[in-house]
Every structure is written in structure tokens, then in C-alpha cells.
From Swiss-Prot:
Domain of life: Bacteria
Protein name: Tetraacyldisaccharide 4'-kinase
Gene for this chain: lpxK
Record organism: Chlorobium limicola (strain DSM 245 / NBRC 103803 / 6330)
Molecular function via GO: ATP binding; tetraacyldisaccharide 4'-kinase activity
Pathway: Glycolipid biosynthesis; lipid IV(A) biosynthesis; lipid IV(A) from (3R)-3-hydroxytetradecanoyl-[acyl-carrier-protein] and UDP-N-acetyl-alpha-D-glucosamine: step 6/6
Length: 350
């Protein structure tokens, strides 16, 4: 889709491209140091800004590690959080921060995986050092860096990059004109590419063929819609097929959310989307609640938004007595799951 502000944003995008190129050159020429952690490190990241299905893939990787007897720790920046510096979200026994303090995606992964250590830190090296010091007697088997492809200060044993099959090349435009965080050619730093959110297999195969020219293994996956979960007990159980809904969310790729709802047989008659990680307030939700009530619509949002709303206790209490649901999602591999498993095994058992 063409950006009407593109002519105005081109100079800023050109400047950003130059800064990114110089920074990467600094790492390649060893002008900037890369720190090697004493634990294996797996990085999961994007070359574009948001909307690639990274969080459910991170959840899959965490569960795979646990299934083979490895105990990972998750280290994230914690986008959208109100706290600063290094913060312990979960010590593997209890969750210590709410979604406002930890960030919505981090809270979601901590809740899904209550037995793992979860830390947030803007400076990932400080986060790793905190884990090493705090959990010296209960050291994790490896560190999973969430959203860290551009964070080159820490060396990694496996660098996974996720690409949205619906928008694989982002019109080759850098931020802020487009969605690219760095030039497409930099994907060659990756050890594995996951082509995700596939809805058209033929189109995905063509994209994968192009990506494989880099010599990097490519895995094909889709973000699969799961069950609809009520916010509270009063919402009740019901057959969701054919439900008339007002969808709302603050995510990077709302089109994918609408597609998932359609897969579930939900009729979306109205929707409202906010910026990714945008905080909720009563002023933002009240018009949605009023319109949904007027039209007799159920409210449906994403699991990530559910965790963001949990930090707003009054809003959550209100939504819990309404027909309000969140959609769970997961990653399902279409091709190459064994490649990812083999690469993870090499990191875990080397």
C-alpha cells in the first residue's frame, strides 16, 4: 500500500538507512564489540517493524526447549512497559510484574510458560549479566533473546529472522517511510529464516524460493487461530461459530487478526484498531463498548491485548462481565519444522 506521506518521509528514511549501514559496518569491522555470553544464545527477530507472528513462535521455541529437557530463560526489551532498566518478570516460580511493568508480549509469554525465568532489559547484555548473577545456583540452559536481530552487542549461536509472507519485502522502504528496520540484504546475517503467516501456499513457495537464494535455510509456517477465551466467568461458554463481533486490537498486523477471526467463523461487523503496544484507557474503550452494546455485538480482541488490559484493573473488571473474548494463537509449521528442531538441538546439546 502506498504511503501518501512517502515524499515527506524519504529524507528521514535515507538518513536512517545511512545510520543503520554505518552501525552494521562498525560491527563487521570490529569497531564495536560483540560480547559472548557464557551460555548458548538463540535470537528471534524481524527485519521489519512488527506483525510477523514473533510471539507465538517464541512460545513454540520455549516449549520445544522444555520438551527436550532444556530450561531456557527469556530476555526481552519489554516494549510498552512503564518500568526502566533490568526487571525480573518471572523467577520461574511466580510472576512478579504485571503487564504494565513488563510489557504485553513479555507478560503473555511469562503466563504461558510459568516455569521459566523471564527478564526485561533495554540493554540486553545487562539483562544476561543479571540472569547470571541472580540465578547462579539455578542456571538456565540457554538464553532466548526476543526481538534482537538488530541488537548485535551480544553474540548468538542461532539467529532466527521471521518474515511476514503477506508483506515479505515491505516495499523495500526503510523506517519511517516504510516498515524495514534495515535493508533487506542484511537478512544474510541470519542462520534461519521463518516465512510466517502464510495464507497462500503457492505464493509462499515462490517467496521461499527467492529467499533460499541467500543460502539460508527457510522454514514455512502459519499463525493458527486457537480457542476463544472469555475474559471472565460471567461471559459464559458458547458456540462461537457465527458470532457477531466488534473486533478491537493494538497490534502490528491487524489484517492477520481479522483473517483469523474469519477462519473461526466469526462475523466481524465492526472493528477498531490502535497502534502496536498502545496503552488502553476508558476513553478509548467506551465508544467501542457503547457501539457493541447498541448493535448487540460481542467484543473480541487478541491474547496480547488481553494481557495489556490485565494491567488496567478497572477496565478488565468491566470487560469481564460483558460478552468479551480473546483469541489464542499458535505457530503451525507447514514445511521445515525438523530443520528448526535440528538447529535448536545443535545449540542445546553442543
Amino acid at each position: 500500500m502506498s504511503n501518501p506521506l512517502s515524499p515527506l518521509l524519504k529524507p528521514a528514511a535515507a538518513l536512517y538507512r545511512t545510520v543503520v549501514r554505518m552501525r552494521n559496518l562498525g560491527f563487521e569491522k570490529k569497531l564495536f564489540k560483540t560480547w559472548k555470553a557464557p551460555l548458548p544464545v538463540v535470537s528471534i527477530g524481524n527485519i521489519s517493524a512488527g506483525g510477523t507472528g514473533k510471539t507465538p513462535l517464541a512460545d513454540w521455541i520455549i516449549n520445544y526447549c522444555l520438551s527436550v529437557g532444556s530450561e531456557p530463560a527469556l530476555l526481552s526489551r519489554g516494549y510498552g512497559r512503564t518500568t526502566k532498566g533490568v526487571q525480573l518478570v518471572s523467577d520461574g516460580q511466580r510472576i512478579l510484574l504485571d503487564s504494565r511493568e513488563a510489557g504485553d508480549e513479555t507478560s503473555m509469554l511469562a503466563a504461558r510458560n510459568p516455569g521459566i525465568i523471564v527478564v526485561v532489559a533495554e540493554k540486553r547484555k545487562e539483562g544476561v549479566e543479571f540472569i547470571l548473577k541472580r540465578f547462579g545456583t539455578r542456571m538456565p540452559s540457554l538464553i532466548i533473546l526476543d526481538d534482537a536481530f538488530q541488537h548485535r552487542q551480544i553474540a548468538r549461536d542461532l539467529d532466527i529472522v521471521i518474515i511476514n509472507a503477506a508483506e515479505p519485502y515491505c516495499n523495500a522502504r526503510m523506517l519511517p517511510e516504510g516498515r524495514l528496520r534495515e535493508p533487506l540484504g542484511n537478512i544474510r546475517r541470519a542462520g534461519l529464516i521463518v516465512l510466517n503467516k502464510i495464507t497462500d501456499r503457492n505464493a509462499a513457495d515462490a517467496i521461499a524460493c527467492d529467499l533460499k537464494k541467500t543460502g539460508i535455510p527457510v522454514v514455512l509456517a502459519k499463525t493458527e487461530a486457537g480457542e476463544l477465551v472469555p475474559f471472565g466467568e460471567d461471559a459464559g461458554e458458547r458456540n462461537m461459530n457465527g458470532i457477531r463481533a466488534f473486533a478491537f486490537a493494538g497490534i502490528g498486523s491487524p489484517e492477520g487478526f481479522l483473517g483469523s477471526l474469519k477462519e473461526k467463523g466469526i462475523q466481524v461487523e465492526a472493528h477498531r484498531f490502535f497502534r502496536d503496544h498502545e496503552p488502553y484507557s476508558g476513553d478509548k474503550l467506551l465508544p467501542i463498548l457503547l457501539e457493541a452494546e447498541k448493535k448487540g455485538l460481542s467484543l473480541v480482541t487478541t491474547e496480547k491485548d488481553y494481557f495489556r488490559l490485565l494491567g488496567e484493573h478497572e477496565l478488565t473488571a468491566t470487560l469481564s462481565v460483558l460478552p468479551c473474548y480473546y483469541l489464542k494463537i499458535s505457530t503451525r509449521f507447514l514445511e521445515g519444522e525438523e530443520i528448526l528442531a535440528s538447529m535448536l538441538n545443535k545449540v542445546i546439546f553442543s
